[in-house]
């Protein structure tokens, strides 16, 4: 199993991605090809004592797509950008999966232009796992495309169901449409048009509308929405989790001696809670609907997140999620005809 890692264009630079890849090779026994500035990568491999590891190779790329560049234009003009080169390796079957934590827009554009969509898939979707009271809930789309037609939402539900079954190991995952109320008559034009289509899709277990407050309750396993709403939900959740942990810490530190003693007693529990809420524990988000396994990580990902993302990428490839999605999309289309 060989995983390509685009090590350029992130908040912390290549060091965290290279370290994460090195740790993944040690922990999971996979091969990795590190794509980016060869000189920088080689220096980091020497630093981490991995320059002689035969399972780690380097593929030089001289350009980087910055976060503020227009994704489609940059992907077309910067042929030697690390994400474009890495996507080319994926397209040519020189690796089994790709992990990137650079520009999300550039990653999606590279996936579309260089790798291509699964036959029958109209729009890819980013599937992001988030913690819930009952385990993990996947939200999609969380940013691949800000606008979505009802048919795109249906395909997201189908792909999200496959993700929940194969990656999260959930039997008959429940699917919910994110809305402002549970009633079938609630919502904007998009929601009202999407609801009956989901209801009639026999390849998913659709239970109806869910509200924002229901996501973390674990009422459903798959939450379907457009990329604009999904991205807002995701980032709000990340910010809220950090705020809650900060408020707890401040309450303990400012609450006097009893609060501090109580804090010591619950410290192990708080560490467990922090770990469960940490996005790094989930690795990255899956870009579903592309013809090969493609993982998108947070721009601020550190080594731990990259190591976990590589593990997810391996699982994605081993479970042959791409082929299953292709079959499910085709099956759904046949049922409607």
PLM regions: where:
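N-terminal phosphate-binding or glycine-rich loops at protein starts, especially the Walker A/P-loop
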Residues: 1-42
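Short, glycine-rich nucleotide/cofactor-binding loops
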Residues: 5-15, 144-154, 296-301
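Short glycine/serine/threonine-rich phosphate/pyrophosphate-binding segments
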Residues: 13-17, 80-93, 97-111, 122-127, ...
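Glycine-rich phosphate/diphosphate-binding loop of Rossmann-like nucleotide-binding domains
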Residues: 15-16, 31-33, 39, 146-212, ...
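Short helix-capping segments at alpha-helix termini
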Residues: 25-28, 46-55, 168, 198-204
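Phosphate/nucleotide-donor binding subsite
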Residues: 50-95
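Glycine-rich phosphate/nucleotide-binding loop
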Residues: 112-125, 131-139, 219-223, 227-336
């Amino acid at each position: 199993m060989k995983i390509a890692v685009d090590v350029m264009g992130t908040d912390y630079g290549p060091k965290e991605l290279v370290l994460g890849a090195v740790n993944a090779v040690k922990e999971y026994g996979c091969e990795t090809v590190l794509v980016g500035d060869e000189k920088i990568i080689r220096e980091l491999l020497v630093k981490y004592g991995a320059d002689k590891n035969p399972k780690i190779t380097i593929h030089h790329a001289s350009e980087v797509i910055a976060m503020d560049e227009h994704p489609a234009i940059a992907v077309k003009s910067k042929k030697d950008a690390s994400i474009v080169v890495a996507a080319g390796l994926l397209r040519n079957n020189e690796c089994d999966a790709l992990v990137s934590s650079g520009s999300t827009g550039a990653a999606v554009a590279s996936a579309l232009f260089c790798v291509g969509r699964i036959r029958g898939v109209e729009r890819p979707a980013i599937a992001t796992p988030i913690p819930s009271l009952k385990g993990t809930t996947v939200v999609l789309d969380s940013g691949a495309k800000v606008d979505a037609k009802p048919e795109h939402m249906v395909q997201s539900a189908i792909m999200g169901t496959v993700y929940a079954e194969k990656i999260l190991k959930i039997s008959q995952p429940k699917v919910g449409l994110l809305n402002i109320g549970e009633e079938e008559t609630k919502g904007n034009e998009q929601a009202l048009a999407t609801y009956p289509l989901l209801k009639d899709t026999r390849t998913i277990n659709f239970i109806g509308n869910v509200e924002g407050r229901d996501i973390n309750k674990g009422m459903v396993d798959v939450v379907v929405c457009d990329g604009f709403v999904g991205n807002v939900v995701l980032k709000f959740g990340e910010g809220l989790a950090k705020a809650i942990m900060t408020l707890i810490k401040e309450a303990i530190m400012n609450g006097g001696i009893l609060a501090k003693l109580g804090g010591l007693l619950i410290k192990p529990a708080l560490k467990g809670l922090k770990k469960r809420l940490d996005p790094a524990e989930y690795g990255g988000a899956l870009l579903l609907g592309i013809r090969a396994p493609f993982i998108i990580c947070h721009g601020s990902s550190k080594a731990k997140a990259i190591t976990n993302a590589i593990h997810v990428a391996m699982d994605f490839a081993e479970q042959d999620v791409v082929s299953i999605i292709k079959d499910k999309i085709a099956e759904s289309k046949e049922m409607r005809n």
